[in-house]
Structure formats: C-alpha cells, structure tokens
Amino acid sequence: MEQLAHLYHEHISELNRRVADITSRENLSGLVIHSGQPHRQFLDDMDYPFKVNPHFKAWLPVIDNPNSWLVVNGHDKPTLIFYRPVDFWHKVADEPTDFWAEYVDIKYLTKADKVAEFLPADIDNWAYIGEHLDVADVLGFNRRNPDSVLSYLNYHRADKTAYELACMRKSNSIAVTGHQAAKTAFYNGASEFEILQVYLSAISQGENQVPYSSIVALNENAAILHYTALEQTSPPQRLSFLIDAGANFHGYASDITRSYAFEKNIFDDLITAMDSMQLQIIAMMKPGVSYVDLHVATHHKLAQILIDFDIATGDAAGLVEQGITSAFFPHGLGHMLGLQVHDMGGFLADEKGTHIASPAEHPFLRCTRTLAENQVLTIEPGVYIIDSLLAQLKQDNRQQQVNWNTVDILRPFGGIRIEDNVIVHCDRTENMTRNFGLNR
C-alpha cells in the first residue's frame, strides 16, 4: 500500500496538470465534479445500484458514496466534499483515512441539499462535471459538461498513470482468481448460476461491485454475445463453457474472457487455434499501430482458421471482403479499458474531440485510436455460430462458401471468445491477464 500511495501522489499531480491546462484554455476557474446521486426505482422506495461518475473516481477510489463532490482547479489541493449524513437506516461511509486522504482537503456534508455552502462563491466561472444537470441548474452552474473539457479529459484518460496501471494489474489478478475457480466449477458439473456464485465468491465481490454483468454461458448459450440469463440447472450434456467476467480494484476494471471444451474434440482444437491467433494479434501491438488495422488483421487470420477447420472455403482475403468472417465474428476486436469497461476516448483523434468513426464494414468496433504508450486495451477475438447472422449468408451466393455440415457440428457449442487485458509499452506489451497465470 505504501508503493500505491507513492504512485497516487504522482497520479494526482498529473490530473492537476491536466485540469490546469484545460481550464486555462477555457477560461475556467476550475471543475466541480459530482460523484452522482441515487436513482429511485419507479413507483418504489428503493434505489437502483449506485454507479459513480467515472470522472470522480479518476481522482480517488471512492466508488460507493453518492452526493459527494470534488472541487479542483489544477493548482490548489483538491477539495473533497464527502457526504456523511446522520442516517440510522443505512451504513454511513467512514471518515476517510486511507492512503489517498492526505492528498485532498476533506469537508463533511451532512445534508445533500446543503452542498452550495461548500462550493466556490464565483460558481459562474466553474464547470459542473456530472450526470445530474437538474442539480447543476439549481446550484447555478452555467457551464455544464462542456464538450471541450470532456473531450480533453476523455482523450487523455487513455494515457494511464503508473498508479492506474498498478490498480489494473490488481484488478486482473483478482479476476484471474475467479476465472480459475469458475473453470474448476464447470468441469465439476456446476450450472451457469452456480458457476457465477463460485466466481463472485472467489473474488469477494458482489454482482453490483464487479464492473459489468458477468457472462456465464454453457453450450449454445455461448453464441449469445451478451448472455446474462443464467440457467439454474445443468444441461443434460455438457459441451462448452464461455465466461466473460471482470473485477474491480479502486474503481479500475478488468475484463477477461475464456472458453473451454468439456472434452477433446474439434471445438477444443478450434479454441487452441483461436488462442494462438489472439496471441499473434497481441504481438503486433506497439505505439503507432492503428487499432483498426489490428481488427482487420484479426479478420484475415480468422478467415484462415475458418478454412483450416473446413468451416468455409475460398481464399482468406475473399472471405473478409465478402463479409463472411463478419458473420462468424460480428463484434470488434476490443476496446480501451480503465475506469470504465468501455473506457471513454476510444474514438478520439485528439484532445479537441475529433471523432474517428468505425469503418462502415466493421460498425461495432469500439476503438479506432492509434496505439500509444501506457494505453490499456482488450484483445478479444471470437468465433460463433449465430443463426441469425448465418441466415444472411444463405440469401446469396456466399452460402456456397460455407460448409454447413461443420456449422451443424459446431452449433451446440455456441462460440469462442478469448480476451486479455494488455498494456502498451514503448518497447513491448504487457499481458496482465496471462502474467497472472490465466493461459489456455
């Protein structure tokens, strides 16, 4: 923790530098960052699970305390307005004493609607950063989530500090422990529901604490890209297992996927081929490389796998050009990762917010940036038997290039996705997921 505290000091210095830069450009006195506030369920007296503003948790690992605020100007010590109501119904957050507390000036707010007493007097020249524009209106903010400020902050979020990288290594380490436990549960005959409970128990995080809804899919359910239904009974025949699950550490996410075959067969061989291909793509990552080019290269490598496994026929380039590979691999290669699972800034060409759209033939790609040092990205190629997409191939001559007998053999297995979390360094890549022991 002492090492993390040292890195945190440097992290805060960098965030202050960024704020000083953008507020000077925009003639702002500073930023007032709202952690957020609870959302009440419709016609109910209960709230939805709280999700903190990512721009708030960028500054400090407070992810579960709504109605808190940060006042930052890039020069003075940040002010944390920390919500501690008098409340006998709920757990009230303790006064902060962790490693980060000495780096902020803490003031305690007991009533959420009294926050104006703690805010700068010249509020007109401060920008509100947060979700609740109605609150910003009441407080008198004229500058609310300025595009220029958000574009600048989101663009630079891709450049992770040493503190952020340390947090992401830890979140990967935690998730790997869960993945290993889930794999064992699968081979021991657990249901989807039971596997998820094993995973959450292994990482000591609840469903509302992990960074996204875990995907635990057996057999053909693995073909559903965002499957979260969770069957509570085991299938009569156990064929395959796909788990896409992460963990949280100090507000930073990991996002890891693995696929398994219950027995040695063609599907297991296909997993081996996809695993090898994924590592080849990771080896291509370095500063200056376009993420779009990596995605396209993945399609060409997948095309050769489809040919090798007699799933499709023809030449690899033709399978890509005709969109046949997209029917088997419809999503993007991956995305930026950090405070959010799909971290902001993946489409930004510069700090002014210039947008780089995904290629028309690959509309679901979530990142179009050029790789640079200290970026963290996921690499997650997949191959699936998705009938609604394959049906489109049957509408034209492309059907002749698909071996439907092999498709029928693979259909009960659903699909494969293999996802690692990778840091781009100046002279190498750091595969955090594999480094913590989650290999094939």
From Swiss-Prot:
Please name the CDD domains in this protein's record.
Answer: Prolidase
Q: Which UniProt keywords apply?
A: Dipeptidase, Hydrolase, Manganese, Metal-binding, Metalloprotease, Protease
Q: Reaction catalysed by this chain?
A: Xaa-L-Pro dipeptide + H2O = an L-alpha-amino acid + L-proline
- List the InterPro entries hit by this protein, alphabetically: Creatin/AminoP/Spt16_N (IPR029149), Creatinase/aminopeptidase-like (IPR036005), PepQ_N (IPR048819), Pept_M24 (IPR000994), Peptidase_M24B_aminopep-P_CS (IPR001131), X-Pro_dipept-like (IPR052433), X_Pro_dipept (IPR022846)
Q: Which Pfam families match?
A: PepQ_N, Peptidase_M24
- Report the GO terms under cellular component: cytosol
In short, the EC number is 3.4.13.9
- Binding sites annotated in the UniProt record for Mn(2+) 1: 255, 335, 380, 419
Q: Which GO terms describe its biological process?
A: proteolysis
- The EC category is hydrolase
What is this protein's name? Xaa-Pro dipeptidase
Cite the GO molecular-function annotations of the record. aminopeptidase activity; metal ion binding; metalloexopeptidase activity; phosphoric triester hydrolase activity; proline dipeptidase activity
